[in-house]
Amino acid sequence: MNAARWSPLLQLLSTSRLDRRIIWMLALSALSNAALLATINAAADNAANALANTRMMVLFAIIVVVFLRTQRYVLLTSISEVERILDAIRLRISRLVARSDLRRLELVGRARIYGSLHRETVTISQAASTLVVACQSAMMVVFSLIYLGWLSRGALALMLIAIVVSVRVHYKRVMQSSRLLHEAQHTENEFFDAFTHMLEGFKEVKLNRARAESLTGQLAAISTRLRDVKVRSAASFALQFLYGQLSVYLLLGAIVFLLPRLAAEYTDVVTKATASILFIVGPLTNLFSTMPYFSAANVAAEAIVELEQQLEAATEPPSDERRPAASAPPTIDMRGVRFSFADSAGHPTFTVGPIDLTIPSAEVLFIVGGNGSGKSTFLKLLTGLYPPDEGLISLGGITLNAATAVWYRSHFAAVLSDYHLFDRLYGVEDVDVEQVNDLLTMFEIESKTGLEDGRFTTLDLSAGQKKRIALAVALLEDRPILVLDEWAADQDPEFRRYFYETLIPRLKGEGRTIVAATHDDRYFSAADRVLKMEDGRFTDLKT
């Protein structure tokens, strides 16, 4: 058997810091189970001897107590330890995500990350107690086989042959089932991706019956494939269990009917050997029945290990965070900057650049251009969220690289097109509630929400109101460079005018640099410069 097939699960469980007591307790539990068999057989031999029978009864009671105590310790301790390991995995994935490069994280995908954080960890958690029972059953089989060999070497030989044949048959079934589980896992991720479209685009789905039917049909097709794969996987495990049961019954038949014909001396121990084999059947059946859980847990562990490897590859190199951020906005320089999106084969599908641009301190710069022209990608390059494929970006003469990335980004506050609004002011130190209330009043949403116990009372607001809160949070960060992507698009005409004619001049007067993507040509006068982007390049300059 190729042990490497089980390495993902073992790799995860190897992080356990359990002391050796659980191993000894596991062995003692299995040994006590085998001792019960020997005690029962010995008591049966001495049934006519009252004194010996009483001693056997006391010994039997002691062994039962030992078995129960050790079994309880092993089960409770192992379950607690597995949950500790899974907790460490969740925290490790969270930290890896937080340190990941944005573009590489986008390529990994939400469904993959959510699947590992929830589905895969739940699978391993549910299998934990079952796998502990399997380990114990394996030890019980070993100790019981030793006792069986002491009774009859012929019976032991037949038992070993049956076990080897059964394991080989089961191994092939497990490999087949594992492939089906992998297929089911990928299909399930595909279903979650499609269902995300249903949830996030629910308004559009409700407005278009044809779209709803088409998307529902797509979900139904994926769900049908998922059902078929899981049925085949479950059927494979069911047949595996059936073959295991069959092999046990054939073995019993061989020992009871065949072995006495081949070895006359066996007839004296046939009853004890048969009882021993029947005693082994339980643990052996447990082993066979836990293989589906073992296989599922291994596939889940493999998915987690692969995700962690992908996230580690996507992790940004260590950055020097000790350098303090500049209090005034330094000049931004971009020289020969280029960034490309690529397809699965690595061929560029869209390129932004080359860009040569200088943004002086406290400048108000508007970026205009059609949809898909590259404005949002440019802003992610500008803020250091996307590393350039070519060229150099510098801030105050300090080049953006792996060592300076955190320092560079610490100068930017942003409300991008795909912004996320948090319910708390994460990362904003020493929150001044009065300042928060002043900003909410300035943005005319003080009657809609507020800050209580460090969190907003509600975020169930219109798109424009949510953007106002997002901008208020960006201002609370008090960073020298403010980047906005179509911020005014969801604002009413009156507040849009306030934004361009009052707020932007006020922020500029405070010494902030403002870079904003916009389509509002009637307010271009609020900018010091207006650059036009087309097909990823700045093709026109308006002043």
Protein language model annotation of sequence segments:
Residues 10-17, 102, 119-127, 179-180, ...:
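An intracellular "coupling" helix at the cytosolic face of ABC transporter transmembrane type-1 domains
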Residues 207, 273, 280-312, 316-317:
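Cytosolic ends of transmembrane helices, especially the final helix of ABC transmembrane type-1 domains
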Residues 98-143:
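Juxtamembrane loop-to-helix connectors within ABC transporter transmembrane domains
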Residues 31-42, 133-174, 231-277:
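A hydrophobic transmembrane-helix motif
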Residues 383:
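Helix-to-loop junction immediately C-terminal to a conserved catalytic motif
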Residues 36-40, 63-106, 110, 129, ...:
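Juxtamembrane helix-loop junctions of ABC transporter transmembrane domains
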Residues 14-70, 149-157, 267:
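Transmembrane helix-loop-helix hairpins at lipid-water interfaces of multipass membrane proteins
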Residues 415-456, 478:
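Conserved "ABC signature" C-loop
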